[in-house]
UniProtKB/Swiss-Prot annotation:
Disulfide bonds: none annotated. It comes from Dissostichus mawsoni. Belongs to the SecY/SEC61-alpha family. This is Protein transport protein Sec61 subunit alpha. The gene is sec61a. InterPro entries: SecY/SEC61-alpha, SecY_CS, SecY_dom_sf, Translocon_Sec61/SecY_plug_dom.
Amino acid sequence: MGIKFLEVIKPFCAVLPEIQKPERKIQFREKVLWTAITLFIFLVCCQIPLFGIMSSDSADPFYWMRVILASNRGTLMELGISPIVTSGLIMQLLAGAKIIEVGDTPKDRALFNGAQKLFGMIITIGQAIVYVMTGMYGDPSEMGAGICLLIIIQLFVAGLIVLLLDELLQKGYGLGSGISLFIATNICETIVWKAFSPTTVNTGRGTEFEGAIIALFHLLATRTDKVRALREAFYRQNLPNILNLIATVFVFAVVIYFQGFRVDLPIKSARYRGQYNTYPIKLFYTSNIPIILQSALVSNLYVISQMLSTRFSGNFLVNLLGTWSDATSGGPARAYPVAGLCYYLSPPESFGSVLDDPVHAAIYIVFMLGSCAFFSKTWIEVSGSSAKDVAKQLKEQQMVMRGHRETSMVHELNRYIPTAAAFGGLCIGGLSVMADFLGAIGSGTGILLAVTIIYQYFEIFVKEQSEMGSMGALLF
């Protein structure tokens, strides 16, 4: 059934816009240039407002997810990377459940990627329609059908641009992937802004700066009681404080420390005697993929819950899925879940919230750990990184594990890879929960993504440098 399904969508994949693979080896400096151009286009789209919207000042239901999904309210990047990640999530679950069978052949892999892109475009249209019809940009009946259609077209074109930018980097023209680049940029921008933002906010304590570091110096300069000023800068509520900043730096350090954990399996050449090497299996074997897929799952649940609560407010089943409330204090207007499934799957706002509602905290911990371990375990099967795939790669390179025959390599790799994937996903979920409970800026998930992505770019840079020999040769 799986192969038939991929064959059915083959004609549709043929008409999709596609980036051709490079016909020659792309130099590192060219990759840097293409990566910079891709990032520039993304940042420009983040600043171009959608034409025709009446208002985007209402409470934002996706405020907590925007950092992770690289989206910006009221702009062309309203949907961010959500459609790409959601399509990846759906295809992964279908392949993991064996509803779709993906073979080891390049043809099947290409069809699978094409199907993912096709679903991404369909989801872009679906999400755009939901955003417009639920009144995120004003009452649809007041805007008129023409304006509603225009907004949907803008969001679709922007979604297509994101798909192609991601594919451009994935095909080898740039460094890493578009998804990783956009997420890391958005998260780092948020952390820097929350630390140094000069924006003033009127609170019950008077006018304060949003940025934690600027607020620290402002409070010390304007308050006569310096001890109280320090206490306020470290512990103030509803705005970024110094403790949040310290927690962020601490989580950064912990994640970087865990990145170094790995098991090196000894391998040797089957052709040349005396040629030995190691095959590293990292603790974070699937990197940040589990947390990205988990974020996509939650964000789509939020979309469905918001849409239903807007249309069927008061319905028992809708309330069971999620009840929402608006918050306007200490920053932009935002909607947050206060009851239902969405509430229990959202992180507690602070350690105090954990103590106030331990059941919420417990359910959130179980969900994060379980979903990350599950996504990590299933991802290796569809991404070509399972024990069988690794054994095949080693065989093609004429490498074997020391002390094992070719036939027993899969069995030996199976002792390590699925365990590393599941335990690594569990650790990623645990670190994300810890960061959320500590109140780190940008959310635990966001920081985890930023660190793992930056570390990936560091590894790419080191690899390219070792191949080129020097920094000068690398860039010039």
